[in-house]
């Protein structure tokens, strides 16, 4: 049972990426779905945040201050 489910899931993923090679917009959407680096919460005002290029982690906006980034209301 588990083996057939795993095979079925792998087939869907492979088909999706094969289809995405033809359609660049679908590839972008698949990459966003596959990424699992976004938290289930947002970082509050005044707290440090990672580089905004790595994802939108702030409740408001992540702005640079020197070499670090902070969540600010802008």
Curated annotation (Swiss-Prot):
Keywords, sorted A to Z: Disulfide bond, Knottin, Secreted, Signal
Primary location recorded for the protein, binned into one broad class: secreted
Coiled-coil features, chain-numbered ranges: none
Disulfide bridges in this chain: 42-59, 49-62, 58-71
Tissues in which the UniProt entry reports expression: Expressed by the venom gland.
Localization annotation: Secreted
Entry annotated with the keyword Transferase: no
Signal sequence extent: 1-20
GO cellular component: extracellular region
Residues excised as propeptide: 21-39
Comment, domains: The presence of a 'disulfide through disulfide knot' structurally defines this protein as a knottin.
Protein name according to UniProt: U2-sicaritoxin-Sdo1a
Organism: Hexophthalma dolichocephala
């Amino acid at each position: 049972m588990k083996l057939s489910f795993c095979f079925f899931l792998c087939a869907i993923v492979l088909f999706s990426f094969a289809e995405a090679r033809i359609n660049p917009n679908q590839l972008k959407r698949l990459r966003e779905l596959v990424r699992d680096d976004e938290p289930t919460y947002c970082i509050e005002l005044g707290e440090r945040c990672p580089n905004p290029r790595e994802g939108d982690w702030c409740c408001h906006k992540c702005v640079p201050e020197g070499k670090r980034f902070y969540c600010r209301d802008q």
